[in-house]
Each structure stands twice: as structure tokens, then as C-alpha cells.
Amino acid sequence: MNTKFPITAKGFKKLEHELKHLKHVERKKISEDIAEAREHGDLSENAEYEAAREKQAFIEGRIKELEDMTARAEIIDICKLSGDNIKFGATVTLIDDDTEEEVTYVIVGEYEADITKKRVSIASPIAKALIGKSVGDFVEVITPKGLKSYEVVTVEYKELDL
């Protein structure tokens, strides 16, 4: 898959950090674990060896995944963005039409999304509904709880705390 995907600079650094850790720390550690397990004799009935090999396969798979992700990443510096229209990286404050409650979301890449921190993926229904809108606009979003309507109150572009 060669499709580029947007990611914040901080999000990209987190991916790079994880990749570096897996390559230089975890890969070495698992090799040592495998060597130690081999010393315990018959590999056909060696649970430690099998567990270490499974962990090695997982680590190698994650390394490949992270290498692919970092190669396809389109790094976007949110601090350099501005404007009234909502796009990737926007911190958007909305008012729920039904409850009058205020909620703030940040539109981020899919690998940075974390709903507990109000960071929503650019591919999510709420982000798709918000893209291109500006302050004063109303948006409708189909959620698991049904159709929700919001008014856009503020649009900001500021540094994220990942």
C-alpha cells in the first residue's frame, strides 16, 4: 500500500521512537531470550523457546508495520496551519444542539486518534462531517446513538499534547 496518510509531527516522532526502540532494544532482548531458551535442550517441547519465537514474530511484524507507516507518512506541522475552515490538525469546539453541552475535538491521523483525549481520526464520521466547515456552521453526524447536530463555535490550530 503506497497511500500517504496525514500525521502530526509529534505523532510521527512517536512512531519513530517506537520503531527505534523495537529495533535497538526489543530485537536484541528477544534474540538473547531465544539463545537462552535454546540452551534448555529439546526445542520441540521447549515452551520458553516457542514463546520467545512468537514474541520475535510479533516484534518483527510491528517493525515492518512501523517502517511502512513512517515511509508513507505525510507530516503536517499544525502550528503552521491557520484559517477559519476546519482541516486536519484543527482543534474544534462544538455545541451539541440537543444538550447545549460544549465539546472539543482535535482532528488527527488515524494512528494518533484517542477518543479519551478527544482526538478523533480524520477518517471518523465526526471529522468527515467537520472538514471544510467554519465557525457558525452546523453539522450533522450519524453516531451509534443516532443523529447528532452540532454548531461549530471555534476553530484553532495549536500544538498538540500527545
Curated annotation (Swiss-Prot):
Record's function text: Necessary for efficient RNA polymerase transcription elongation past template-encoded arresting sites. The arresting sites in DNA have the property of trapping a certain fraction of elongating RNA polymerases that pass through, resulting in locked ternary complexes. Cleavage of the nascent transcript by cleavage factors such as GreA or GreB allows the resumption of elongation from the new 3'terminus. GreA releases sequences of 2 to 3 nucleotides.
SUPFAM superfamilies according to UniProt: FKBP-like (SSF54534), GreA transcript cleavage protein, N-terminal domain (SSF46557)
Domain of life: Bacteria
UniProt GO MF annotations: DNA binding; RNA polymerase binding
GO biological process terms held by the UniProt record: DNA-templated transcription elongation; regulation of DNA-templated transcription elongation
Pfam families reported for this sequence: GreA_GreB, GreA_GreB_N
Residues in the signal sequence: none
Family: Belongs to the GreA/GreB family.
Swiss-Prot/TrEMBL keywords: Coiled coil, DNA-binding, Transcription, Transcription regulation
Coiled coil: 45-74
Protein name, as recorded: Transcription elongation factor GreA
Signal listed as a keyword: no
Annotated HAMAP family: GreA_GreB (MF_00105)
Stored PROSITE patterns: GREAB_1 (PS00829), GREAB_2 (PS00830)
